[in-house]
Each structure stands twice: as structure tokens, then as C-alpha cells.
Amino acid sequence: MEQIKLDSIADAIEAIRKGEVIIVVDDEDRENEGDFICAAECVTPEIINFMSKEGRGLICAPISEARCTELKLDLMVGSNTATHETPFTVSVDLLGNGCTTGISASDRSKTIRALVDPDTKPEDLGRPGHIFPLKAKDEGVLRRVGHTEAAVDLARLAGFKPAGVLIEIMSEDGSMARLPELKQIATKFNLKLISIKDLIEYRLTHESLVKREIGVDMPTNLGDFDLIAFRQISTGEVHLALIKGTWEKDEPVMVRVHSSCVTGDIFGSCRCDCGPQLHKAMEMIQQEGKGVILYMNQEGRGIGLLNKLKAYKLQEQGRDTVEANLELGFKMDQRDYGTGAQILRDLNISKLRLITNNPVKRAALAGYGLEITEAVPIEIPSNPHNLEYLKTKRDKMGHTILKKD
């Protein structure tokens, strides 16, 4: 099958800057769909009409987390159980200003423009309405690989406020339009066609989420390593890279992405398998002679130490690790891997022999443009205190552990 040629990100940014609509496609392993996207500041009734007629999906308005706070736009639901956790807020209409039904192309374009107008106040927006704001992650596609973040990133890169307009593109029969048809649509209307994957690559090349702060020698009882501290620019959080040896640019490197676990890594808690996994990974890399352990500041799968202890208390009352997270208002796994991906790129790693039993981790890192050449299993014996925890990771989170007979 002939490879479909996509446009460059630079050309797409220029099109957005000119107020044009473009098509953005995501990964075939995610939704494998395309969206019409433009900058919110450039939306017109004509663009809304075009999107509605040719896209046939749901018109949404991705905006920044800060803007959601300013306009007091709460999330539509407290616990998001959608497949890809699309961050819908309450829907809105602009009140007054010539708006009537809220659904006309004119009314919807006015509502979207109001979302980015600094003079708009929360009371200027009626709830519910006909425009669906989406709350984009602050670091865009480097935090979440979705059209929501792509729209905001493209608007920002084009010099506009971080807000966009998007709609899913459907075929005439109501099914989702896939890449070959999206290419035809792009050609028909002379639109730029890009992928989120290429946008991630562009941002990773032109921007930095992390700063290398300091490196030191780190002799351990499992071997001699180098330790480098990276500061996450947006949050100030510090992440560590424990490094053994050197490698060529395109060489597959053994890597473990390990989330910090005070209870397991430091106190030797038997409630999880984190400490043994960390030490086993160090042994594997020491034996390999080269490799990296990323020690990410993401305690409790990203919910923080205090909330992890609250989750432990719920587990003592009969919940499993997933149920406890959900009851506390978190996802089963709150982590993102964009920061870790950029640290690996800083370390000149693009191909990984990833030490993991977690399929989500493999897919997430691959989504940031890293090539996983091999998933290297890490076998840790269970104990009476963590057996149910490990079973939950296997049965509810898909980890390849405790294989059933």
C-alpha cells in the first residue's frame, strides 16, 4: 500500500496563522480518526458551517486549564470513564450579543470567540449550551496525545491564544473517516494534513520540558552508575536518571521507567512490588553493561504520597488498588510519560528495550515517538501482602504477571 504523505508541521502552523482549517490525525492505535482544527480566535460562521457540513461530528472548543478556571468551567463529570478520557467541561452558550438559539453557525462562532476574549466573564456564558469546551493539559501533546491538546498547541505555535476549534470527521455513511479518505478530503478542500505524532516530534525538537541540572557519580551495592537530576520546567519537580555505560544514537537501550515509591523503595513495604522491581532492574542493567533507570517523581501512579496512603486505607477496608484510586476521584493510573520521553531524548535514546510488564506504559512511550524494540519482562515473586494487589494489576490493568495456568 502506498504511503500517504503528510504535510509538515511548519506548513500547518502557517495555515493556522492565516486563519485556515487543517486536518489532524491521531495514532492508528488510539482513535485513528481525523479532526478539522482551527484557532479559536479565527473562527467564523463560515468555518462553523463548513465543519458541521463536512465534518459531521461534534464541534468542541479546546482551551487551557487556566482559561477554564477563569471562566469557572467545571468538568462535565467528576469521574471521567470515557475511553480516552476526553476532558469535557459543562457546555456553554454566549448570552446576549445577538445570540438567540445558540446552535446557529453565527451563535456558535460568537460563543467560541467569547471563550478566548479576555473581557468575557463567567456570568456571560449560559450553562448548558451548544459549545463543548475541552480542558487541555498545560503541556499539550507532550502530556496527552490527543486532538484537544493538538488544537491548543497549534494555536499557540501560530501566535494565538491557546484555544482552538475541532470536530471529528465522519464519512457520508456515518462511520469515521480514516487516513485514505482524510487525504482525499484534504486534497478536495486544499487543506494541510498532519499527524499528532509529527506535532509531538516537532515540539520535542523545538522546545524543552526539562532542564538537566546536575550529574554525579553514584556507586551502589548493585554496581557503579551515574546519576543525573532533571528539573521539570513547568512544575519544578525533580526526576532522576540512573545511568550505566554509553551507547550509539540509534542503539536500542535497556530502560526502566520507574515511578517513585517511598513506601516500597525506601521502607521496603511488602504491599507492592516497587522496591524489588527497582533493584531487579538495576541488576539487569548492571549485567547488561549499559542502560537507564528513569526515577520519575510520580508517587502512587501519579496521585502523590498522601493520597496513596489514603488509597492504602481504603484497601484495608476491602477495595482493590484500582477501586481505591477511583473512589478518591483519580484515574486508575494518573501518570503521563511525556516528561520521561523528553528525558530519554536528552540522553540520546530513541530506541528502547523497555523493562516493563505494563502494556499501557509501552503504548504511552511509543506515542511520544520512541521506538520500543522489545518489552523485557521483570519477574518478581509475590508475597502474602501483595498477592491481591498483583492480581488486580494483572486482571484490571493488563500487566503480564502471575500468569494463569
UniProtKB/Swiss-Prot annotation:
Mg(2+) 1 binds at residue 31. Keywords: GTP-binding, Hydrolase, Lyase, Magnesium, Manganese, Metal-binding, Multifunctional enzyme, Nucleotide-binding, Riboflavin biosynthesis, Zinc. Its EC number is 4.1.99.12, 3.5.4.25. D-ribulose 5-phosphate binds at residues 30-31, 35, 144-148, 168. Mg(2+) 2 binds at residues 31, 147. One of its GO terms (biological process) is riboflavin biosynthetic process. One of its GO terms (molecular function) is GTP cyclohydrolase II activity. One of its GO terms (cellular component) is cytosol. The record marks 130, 168 as: Essential for DHBP synthase activity. Disulfide bonds: none annotated. The active site is at residues 333, 335. HAMAP family: RibA, RibB, RibBA. In the N-terminal section; belongs to the DHBP synthase family. In the C-terminal section; belongs to the GTP cyclohydrolase II family. Catalyzes the conversion of D-ribulose 5-phosphate to formate and 3,4-dihydroxy-2-butanone 4-phosphate. This is Riboflavin biosynthesis protein RibBA. It comes from Cytophaga hutchinsonii (strain ATCC 33406 / DSM 1761 / CIP 103989 / NBRC 15051 / NCIMB 9469 / D465).
